[in-house]
């Protein structure tokens, strides 16, 4: 079923909308939540919460990209749950992904508190990614949006785990230089 048809089911308030959404994007949503939370039960709850949020948001919203819309809801819910679960604990898979970027970026909480700065930073990162090859953009997004492991990224792109790690290290250095030149980082 096409995304436009699923969106029309939401507008018609058909109960099939959520089941069709789950059939098409359930695997993606669960993978995203699992990568952040590392708990199948919490991931399932976040995916269900995201589906409910989608039900309430459509209508009136009509997302241009249904997987991006639902993925963002899943990711936000998962990060909120993750923060609640690990308020005093550290060293999870998601922490390691974020710590790779935190060496030169503000912490995610600081960035959220400074909404304008976060938007400016996001726009600068998007511009940086526009200068990269498609494979490097996929590499970056799989690591820092989907929180995939180096092994998973390597398998997806047909490269070794070590190559994925090395390329991301180089990209982080390039990103830091780019953000400094753009005066996003001081």
Language-model segment annotations:
Residues 11-12, 38, 48-66, 84-85:
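Sigma70-family region 2
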Residues 11-20, 30-49, 161, 184-186:
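Short, charged helix-capping/linker segments at alpha-helix termini
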Residues 21, 25, 29, 50, ...:
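Residue-level preference for hydrophobic side chains embedded in well-ordered alpha helices
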Residues 23, 30-34, 51-59, 75-83, ...:
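Short amphipathic alpha-helical interface segments enriched in basic and hydrophobic/aromatic residues
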Residues 24-26, 36, 131, 141-148:
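Short helix-capping/turn signature of helix-turn-helix
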Residues 65, 79, 125-126, 136, ...:
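DNA-recognition helix of helix-turn-helix
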Residues 72-94, 118:
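Arg/Lys-rich amphipathic alpha helix in sigma70-family domain 2
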Residues 99-130:
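Acidic, proline/glycine-rich intrinsically disordered inter-domain spacer in sigma factors
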């Amino acid at each position: 079923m096409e995304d436009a048809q699923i969106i029309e089911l939401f507008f018609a308030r058909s109960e099939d909308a959520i089941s069709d959404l789950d059939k098409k994007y359930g695997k993606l949503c669960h993978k995203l939540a699992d990568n952040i939370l590392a708990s199948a039960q919490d991931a399932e709850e976040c995916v269900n919460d995201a589906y409910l949020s989608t039900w309430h948001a459509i209508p009136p919203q009509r997302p241009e990209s249904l997987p991006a819309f639902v993925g963002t809801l899943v990711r936000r819910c998962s990060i909120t749950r993750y923060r609640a679960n690990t308020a005093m604990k550290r060293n999870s898979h998601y922490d390691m992904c974020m710590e790779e970027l935190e060496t030169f970026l503000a912490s995610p909480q600081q960035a959220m508190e400074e909404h304008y700065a976060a938007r400016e930073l996001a726009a600068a990162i998007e511009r940086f990614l526009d200068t990269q090859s498609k494979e490097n953009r996929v590499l970056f997004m799989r690591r820092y949006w989907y929180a995939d492991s180096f092994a998973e990224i390597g398998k997806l792109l047909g490269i070794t785990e070590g190559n994925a790690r090395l390329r991301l290290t180089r990209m982080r250095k390039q990103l830091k230089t780019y953000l400094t030149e753009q005066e996003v980082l001081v």
